[in-house]
Structure formats: structure tokens, C-alpha cells
Amino acid sequence: MPNPNEIVSALVAAGFTHLVWIPDSHLGTWEPALADSPLAPIRVCREGEAVGVAIGLLLGGANPLVALQCTGFFEAGDAVRNAVHDMKLPLKLLIGVRGARAAKAGTGRDNCPHFAQKLVEAWELPHAQFDPAEANADVSAALATLTQVGPRALLWSE
């Protein structure tokens, strides 16, 4: 599994200028590595606010990444819809999918993995899935999927 320093290095290498986020128990482990990076992490209070901040950064010429957990993605739906479909902005989202590994193993009871997948499809967001715990997990390749033209989401298994 990639460590936080490898993840932050891959974010920088992918060309992101800012990480707009609400750290959760998984994504929050990146915080010490972010402190020493050229990324400018911006903590927000709500996930819809994260999308609004990212919109401002995009309009100002920056290349932000919004990182949030799946339940926060659900909360931010209208802001995502507005950014991607009304404003036609190349919004990039890293969505932590709580309970994804347990669901894959058939032991999970959390419905977040089920609805996260359905919601990115409902919003017509091109997306990829990534599980950092897999043996051949390549965080740089996973994050490279977010560098393609247009809006993109990466469903990050937790």
C-alpha cells in the first residue's frame, strides 16, 4: 500500500496545485506529508463548499483536486452537477469509498460503495476505481486517470 508521502508526491507529479478537502480517517493520514509539500491544502467545512472553492481555483487558473469521502460526495451532488454540467469545468474528484474492501469481500454492511458507484454514473462523471491495498497498486497511474481532459473522478477504496 502506498504511504502518504508517495501519495502526496504522486499528487504533485500529476500537476495538482491545491488539495481541497475534508480529511476523514483514511485521507487524513496524508496530512503530515501535505505539510511539507508544494500542494496547498485547503480544509473546508462542507463538501459542497469544497466544490465551490475548487470552482474558484479553476476559474483563477489553478488545478485543484477535491478529496472527500463518499458520503460527502452525496452531499455535494448539486455543486458537482453545476460545476461539471452547467459550467463545463474540468472538476477533479478523489472520492474515498468507505467500506469498499469489506463490500468486495462480501463482509460489509455499509451501502456507501453501492451508491458511490451509482452516483458517479448518474452524474455522468468519467471515473476509475483504485484500491491502494492491492498488491500491484500504482498510485501514480491511478492519479494519472484524473489528468485526462474534462471532469474526472477516482473512486479510492477504503
Task: Give short role names for the model-derived ranges.
Residues M1-E158:
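Thiamine diphosphate
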